[in-house]
């Protein structure tokens, strides 16, 4: 294997970030994991964020309805697009590549999904969701996400962001810290979702 190749370097980035002992990385990966049964998956997490903004900003019923409809369409279209591309490209997951070429003992911080790696559904839908919220609230709105505040299995303390862009970037990078996506995938997926 060519250790100077782009793919090898991407895999090493996943490996290094996954093994980093900094609890911040682990907390981010777990906070944005959004497994079923906790926040209703990534889409559910973004709907709870939207609801927090609706309440905080005092949106009227018609304004809230517009946000929820646009958000629902955007995240569903994002996931449809992402999964079409996943099976078009059928790209290998970091865990598979790392096991095969670097470290057969490697394990991810969060569960590695049983479908192709590229693009990242979380990043794709995060980009789409935050673009919708920006169209209603502007990007510079600060947000404190308390979606996971009552969870005891992870550090669910509310997370505060100075902008929606900052939040979407954290959602995206959390997948690298979880060990389930390559950095290049995250960057491309977030950019696609924003379009």
Predicted regions and their residues:
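Acidic/polar surface patches and capping/hinge elements
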Residues: 1-195
């Amino acid at each position: 294997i060519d250790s100077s190749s782009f793919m090898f370097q991407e895999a090493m980035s996943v490996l290094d970030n996954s093994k980093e002992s900094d609890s911040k990385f682990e907390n981010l990966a777990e906070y944005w994991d959004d497994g079923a049964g906790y926040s209703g998956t990534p889409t559910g997490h973004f709907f709870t964020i939207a609801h927090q903004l609706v309440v905080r900003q005092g949106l009227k019923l018609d304004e809230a309805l517009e946000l929820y409809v646009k958000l629902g369409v955007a995240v569903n279209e994002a996931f449809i697009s992402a999964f079409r591309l996943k099976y078009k490209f059928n790209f290998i997951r970091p865990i598979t590549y790392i096991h095969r070429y670097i470290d057969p003992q490697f394990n991810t911080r969060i569960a590695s999904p049983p479908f192709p790696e590229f693009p990242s559904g979380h990043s794709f839908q995060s980009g789409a969701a935050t673009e919708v919220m920006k169209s209603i609230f502007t990007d510079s709105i600060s947000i404190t996400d308390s979606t996971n505040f009552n969870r005891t299995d992870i550090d669910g303390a509310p997370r505060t962001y100075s902008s929606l862009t900052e939040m979407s970037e954290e959602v995206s990078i959390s997948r690298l810290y979880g060990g389930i996506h390559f950095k290049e995938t995250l960057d491309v997926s977030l950019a696609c979702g924003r379009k």
